[in-house]
UniProtKB/Swiss-Prot annotation:
Keyword NAD: no
Bias (Basic residues): 396-405
SUPFAM superfamilies, per database record: Homeodomain-like (SSF46689)
Protein name: Zinc finger protein 541
Classification lineage: Eukaryota, Metazoa, Chordata, Craniata, Vertebrata
Length: 804
């Protein structure tokens, strides 16, 4: 023990006993209740006074002219070296205060009278009046008995919750609610807390003292100096950080008066005379709403997030500043300044009105000594904080946070009156002109009719349901406002406004009144006069004679309709409507109607109502037009406008009609030429070779038009079924058993009757016919094709549309 005090005396040579006496004389105990401090037990009670100057010596110098015992001097006092909290001894009393229980030790010594050691009690008062905590474990040994409980009233500055400064080794142990904390990594020492409920001195442990003035201040000292609240009392109107502000991470701590605190921190560093090489210069960020300081952009952004959401205080009052980590138990109470009515009943009001709420400093906070001027510090931080955001954020954050998606904005429906009408009706957004130009000559301006949505305005200029709208890019206008761009000028003398489709016209909903919006109702007449009136419509079909009752007449009419639908008739059998009209003009005579269809055609006088009526398939296509149509179809597929531009003699409607008529007869396949064209263009030697392999005796007939039953065939079309169902349908050969043909090594194709020597060749050839699944061609020319080798134009002309 003597060696320890020799080392203390050697390191504290510059301190005098006069300063100790002066400091102790200015800290009297409160009247009425003596603050009895049971001294530390040990064999060296008379050598404790040199410790008191160590507290004030940290800020001693020409920069602090105040008296050493004054409240201003105590506010600027820098705490000593930080230490860990004691494991297992910190517990919470019934009212939320912290208690430090005394731990009995086997070492016992006679207790000393407190009156014989006035310096120790004054030292305890001075330590408790400081804002930070002082670690005395580096000075006193831990062999003595642990301290006992202090009595009396709380001292000035001690009524606020104490702040636990972090240990230098980064290991801080605490307790959570109702649980004991983990064991301390450094062992025996205990924390001295400025708690108003049960303040106690902690035990001390023996360690190497580092109190020399030439040494650099520890990070804990600078941290407490920079975070000490040396300004006026905290303003209750200013919002403090809540526990909600801590859940996003980052170092978020409130500085009520950052200008004065940073000035004090800078002064303390200069007075200490130590180097600050242990810190790295980093940027600080200040909240523009509540003037709180942050050391990371992440902390500021999370703080601003809760500013925007307006988190309410749980009990409508200021929240205590607590740790967001697992090492410290959050305090339950917040002591208000004097005069606060909302203070908890169990909390004592502080005697010193200038004391501010203490701060909680975690062990991982990066402390930056700031040496800016007092007047320009806040303004410079607001300007420089935004400029350094992009640079510092890329270095401090390891990974970038994915930006959140933009919120969906649904613009409200517009309303001229400020609120929607009944049943949620709103004004129409469809463009309508203000005035009708054709009504201006009457001398009165007539408003345009109201067109409720989704109806389209009948007097619109454009051709679309919705007019073109552009969102405003200015910051003042809301996104749902439309840009009213007048493409034409307004004549102010007459009030005529010719607007375009992208003009927003404000028309209030109203009932359209006038003869233009009302139906013309004729006068009421007798029902007997209705039979005399002639029908306005033209009669184009009427069942004549006994057609409705005679079955034979009905059968003849049915046969006429079947012939009109076959390829016997000009137009490809698409003139069923024409046949019925001819039968009506013949007054039910089927023979006269058939002659009209085949020979004369429907000749109508110019005064007839159907004189200009166009029947389907009545257009005449020349061979050149058919060739151009096929070439254009292979090039442009079903783009009939380009096909019309290629032909130039037929309209788009005529091209579409021609395509769908011939689609039932000849397949237009872009992948390959139609089967009919290939059969026509076969080489003569191939035909002769086929005839030698498959002997046949074709039966010829003058006409090669198939009957109506062969109009449309599916893929399951078989040659044998055609030959059996229609023996006179067209050129064909006698069917032979398939086994006899295949037994001779000949494999014909059942679709196009091409003959192959190998079955694999025929199977590969059959893949070409799989593309044609929808319809089979009507015209199927059978082998041999020698008598029917016609040109493409002649073949198309024979099966073409009507020829009158």
């Amino acid at each position: 023990q003597m060696q320890v005090f020799q080392m203390i005396t050697k390191s504290q040579r510059i301190f005098s006993h006069a300063q100790v006496s002066k400091a102790s004389s200015q800290l009297p105990a409160p009247e009425g209740k003596p603050a009895a401090l049971r001294p530390l037990q040990g064999p060296w009670p008379q050598q404790l006074p040199p410790l008191a100057p160590a507290v004030d010596s940290l800020n001693a110098g020409p920069g602090n002219p105040e008296a050493e015992g004054s409240p201003a001097r105590r506010r600027k006092t820098t705490p000593g070296v930080a230490r860990e909290a004691s494991p297992g001894n910190t517990r919470r009393d019934a009212k939320g205060g912290l208690k430090v229980a005394a731990v009995p030790t086997p070492l016992a010594a006679p207790s000393l009278d407190p009156s014989r050691n006035p310096d120790i009690s004054s030292l305890a008062k001075q330590l408790r009046s400081s804002k930070g905590t002082l670690d005395l474990g580096d000075i006193f040994p831990s062999t003595g008995q642990r301290q006992t409980q202090l009595g009396g009233e709380e001292l000035p500055g001690a009524s606020l919750p104490g702040k636990q400064a972090p240990a230098e080794n980064g290991a801080v142990s605490g307790t959570t609610k109702g649980e004991k904390g983990p064991p301390c990594s450094r062992g025996g020492g205990y924390r001295l807390l400025g708690n108003p409920r049960a303040p106690r001195f902690s035990g001390f442990r023996k360690e190497k003292a580092k109190m020399d003035m030439c040494c650099a201040a520890s990070p804990s000292q600078v941290a407490m100096a920079s975070f000490s609240s040396a300004g006026p009392p905290a303003d209750p109107s200013k919002s403090k950080l809540t526990i909600f502000s801590r859940i996003q991470g980052g170092n978020i701590y409130r500085l009520p008066h950052p200008v004065k605190e940073e000035n004090v921190a800078g002064g303390g560093n200069q007075q200490n005379g130590g180097s600050t090489d242990w810190t790295e210069p980093r940027s600080t960020f200040i909240c523009k709403n509540c003037s709180q300081m942050f050391y990371t952009e992440k902390g500021l952004s999370s703080h601003m997030c809760f500013h925007s959401d307006q988190w309410p205080s749980p009990r409508g009052k200021q929240e205590p500043q607590v740790f967001g980590t697992e090492f410290c138990k959050p305090l339950r109470q917040v002591l208000r300044p004097e005069g606060d009515r909302h203070s908890p009943p169990g909390a004592k009001k502080p005697l010193d009105s200038t004391a501010a709420a203490p701060l909680v400093v975690p062990h991982s906070i990066p402390v930056v000594p700031v040496t800016r001027h007092v007047g320009s510090m806040a303004m410079e931080q607001e300007k420089d904080g935004e400029e350094r955001d992009s640079k510092e954020s890329s270095q401090q954050r390891k990974r970038k946070k994915r930006p959140p998606p933009k919120r969906l904005f649904i613009p409200p429906p517009p309303s001229t009156a400020g609120e929607p009408g009944p049943a949620g009706c709103h004004q129409s957004r469809l463009r309508s002109p203000m005035f009708l130009v054709d009504r201006l000559l009457k001398g009165l301006f007539q408003c345009s009719p109201y067109t409720p949505p989704p109806m389209l305005s009948p007097i619109r200029e454009g051709s679309g349901v919705y007019f073109n709208t552009l969102c405003s890019t200015s910051t003042q206008a809301s996104p749902d406002q439309l840009i009213s761009s007048m493409l034409d000028q307004v004549d102010g003398s007459f009030g005529i406004c010719v607007v375009k489709d992208d003009t927003k016209i404000s028309i209030e909903p109203h009932i359209n009144i006038g003869s233009r919006f009302q139906a013309e109702i004729p006068e009421l007449q007798e029902r007997s006069l209705a039979g005399i009136d002639e029908h306005v419509a033209s009669l184009v079909w009427k069942p004549w004679g006994d057609m409705m009752i005679n079955p034979e007449t009905q059968d003849r009419v049915t046969e006429l309709c079947n012939v009109a639908c076959s390829s016997v008739m000009p137009g490809g059998g698409t003139n069923l409507e024409l046949a019925l009209h001819c039968l009506h003009e013949a007054q039910g005579n089927v023979q006269v109607a058939l002659e009209t269809l085949l020979l004369r055609g429907p000749h109508k006088p110019p005064t007839h109502l159907l004189a200009d009526y166009r029947y389907t398939g009545s257009d005449v296509w020349t061979p050149i037009e058919k060739r151009l149509f096929k070439k254009a179809f292979y090039a442009h597929k079903k783009d009939f406008y380009l096909i019309h531009k290629t032909i130039q003699t037929k309209t788009v409607a005529q091209c579409v009609e021609y395509y769908y008529i011939w689609k039932k007869m000849i397949k237009f396949d872009c992948g390959r030429a139609p089967g009919l064209e290939k059969r026509v263009k076969r080489e003569p030697e191939e035909v002769e070779r086929t005839e030698e392999k498959v002997p046949c005796s074709p039966r010829e007939r003058p006409s090669h038009h198939p009957i109506p039953e062969l109009k449309i065939k599916t893929k399951s079309y078989r040659r044998e079924s055609i030959l059996s169902s229609s023996p006179n349908a067209g050129p064909k050969r006698t069917p032979e058993p398939s086994g006899s043909v295949e037994s001779q090594g000949i494999f014909p194709c059942r679709e196009c009757e091409r003959v192959f020597d190998k079955i694999k060749s025929r199977n590969a050839h059959m893949k070409r016919h799989r593309l044609q699944d929808h319809v089979e061609p009507i015209v199927r020319v059978k082998w041999p094709v020698k008598p029917f080798q016609l040109k493409e134009e002649e073949l198309g002309a024979d099966i073409g549309p009507l020829q009158w």
